[in-house]
């Protein structure tokens, strides 16, 4: 079963600024190395669906639904195809904001996804190492955008 993954970064900008960058979902391709496009279907809030195009060896579409939307504090979406939850926690600090990105898989992944990870993505350990590197890259780019 996939384990929770987490990455954190300190950003020299207030939570409101980080939130504005993070929740402008059309900008997600600027930050995430695997996201080609993320299009919200309506206003960005809890319950909103997104249509996404991703790239990791090959291009593939996904959909997600925003499951947590607490301005300046917490944001999360659940990927419908593999049931993973990607979340972001914002915490005010003396120097700005601590931003934490997490990937949780509370119900495991469906069998076709498991087969894809094992056969096309090098197995769970290699895949998770790749995901953590992508999370760190995403956070670094969000930091750069928020500190401008």
What do these predicted ranges mean?
Residues 39-85, 93-98, 133-148:
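Glycine-rich portal/gate segments that line the openings of hydrophobic small-molecule binding cavities
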Residues 79-133, 142:
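Beta-strand/loop substructures that line and gate deep hydrophobic ligand-binding cavities in soluble
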Residues 12-15, 19, 125, 129-132, ...:
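Short amphipathic alpha-helical segments with heptad-repeat character
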């Amino acid at each position: 079963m996939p384990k929770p993954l987490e990455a954190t970064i300190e950003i020299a900008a207030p939570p409101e600024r980080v939130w504005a960058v993070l929740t402008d979902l059309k900008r997600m391709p600027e930050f995430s190395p695997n996201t080609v496009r993320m299009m919200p279907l309506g206003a960005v809030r809890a319950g909103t669906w997104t249509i996404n195009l991703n790239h990791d060896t090959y291009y593939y579409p996904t959909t997600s639904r925003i499951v947590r939307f607490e301005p300046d504090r917490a944001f999360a979406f659940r990927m419908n195809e593999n049931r993973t939850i990607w979340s972001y926690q914002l915490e005010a600090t003396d120097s700005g904001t601590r931003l934490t990105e997490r990937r949780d898989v509370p119900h495991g992944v469906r069998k076709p996804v498991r087969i894809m990870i094992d056969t096309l993505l090098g197995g769970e350990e290699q895949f998770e190492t790749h995901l953590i590197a992508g999370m760190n890259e995403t956070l670094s780019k969000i930091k750069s955008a928020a500190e401008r």
